[in-house]
Amino acid sequence: MKLLFELSGEHPDLPAAELECVGTVLDRRTQVAVAECPDPEAVGRLALTHVVMEYLGECEPSKEGLTGLLRDLAIRTEKPFAGRVKLIQGAHMDAARLEVEKLIGGLIAGPVSLRDPVEEYRAVVSDDRCYFGRVIARIDRGGFEFRNPMRRPFFHPGVMMPRMGRALVNISLVRPGELIFDPFCGTGGILLEAREIGVRVLGSDFDPVMVAGYRQNLPGSDVMIADATAVPVCDGALDSVVTDLPYGQSVRIHGESMDRLYDGSLAEIRRILKPGRRAVVVTHRDITPIAARHFTILQEHEQRVHKSLTRRILVLG
């Protein structure tokens, strides 16, 4: 099924990269993407998307262009519906938003209900294109807020927020029922997001305090105290690895140097990851020369967290 995605503006690239877990991206504009998705219900796992629509068509961003598209579509519905318009980051049409919404309502055969619609038809204008679709899902962000690290039984500062953790799990392309591993699991934030979408999880950390905290946050999930450069896991046993590599003075590190730790842990990830599968690694400085010794670098992203912290995200295969 061809779907239209209205993406979050939290990052210029990560929302579109995340879509690979549900389909093949066919077209992309600012905060908008079109993808072919074999299972539309899978979109519920996404973290960096706002609205998902059945793709109905596209046109130039003008009243005339949308009129022609709607006449060609000749949509009929018995359900009460509303027409909405979304202008992305300064995009514009040659008519006011309310006028365009009225146009949509007038060219779809069916009962209009702005207060209590059962269906919503949405025109999304981005850059030089107007996309049109029927809303089939809105991503519930309340669940992510409910899993805020401050709400967990065990809290440790500096942990990744749930939406970003989920996005990284999705970018790894792991599927429900498969096994994901985090060799620097800390209090379990990344694996908590993986478990929420039906993925089997395994964590390890060298710090017994973090492992104890993990057990509080993810009761019943497998975790072990282990050196990330020598993990007691068989070769090619894992479907996915997602991890936030340690940094700074606030973490307990086993190894002669940070570079040695990174090199050893990436070599170990390579060993235990199934051939053809992905690892997603977050760092806080450039380690591409180290990563390139063990993997092909498929994607690189940067995310500014605050003035003194920029995350570097490597997708490895």
Task: Label every PLM stretch briefly.
Residues 1-53, 61, 65, 69, ...:
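Class I S-adenosyl-L-methionine-dependent methyltransferase catalytic core
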Residues 74-108, 112-117, 121-130:
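A short N-terminal interaction module
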